[in-house]
Amino acid sequence: MRLITGRLAAAALVSLFVLTWRAHVDQDVVVAQTRKPIMITRIYTGPDGQSRAEQVELKLNGGASEMIKATGVQFSSRPPAPASDWHVGPMRQYVITLSGRAELEVAGGKKIPVGPGHIDLVEDLTGKGHITKVLEDRVTLQLPLVDQTPRSN
């Protein structure tokens, strides 16, 4: 009797493990199928000298992007501040917001809300530039790119 009870208990534990594992795997599949693409806000200078913004999907091949060469890494912390004057990017770079909120403005009054996880590709190195307004303490990671030639539109 003890042997049968032990085997039933072991079978129940194995069944529970299999059901739990199966539910976890099914959940991972659903997450993978509904995963959103990684989007980047590209800020660039249009032919009229005005800064523009567009959403660009980061291409992933096998779950990773191609290697992007950067010249270094810089962290920046900024307190809330009124909107800056119009300015161009200092160099072609990625700016990734780690915490806080800001707002970018480009030509035509288009405003881009920026929060944690937001990625900007700053390419407006000439022309009128853009405005930055820090709304909450903002920490960013800046990755200046080796290739300083903005891609053509």
Predicted regions and their residues:
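Bacterial N-terminal signal peptides that target proteins for export
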Residues: M1-A10
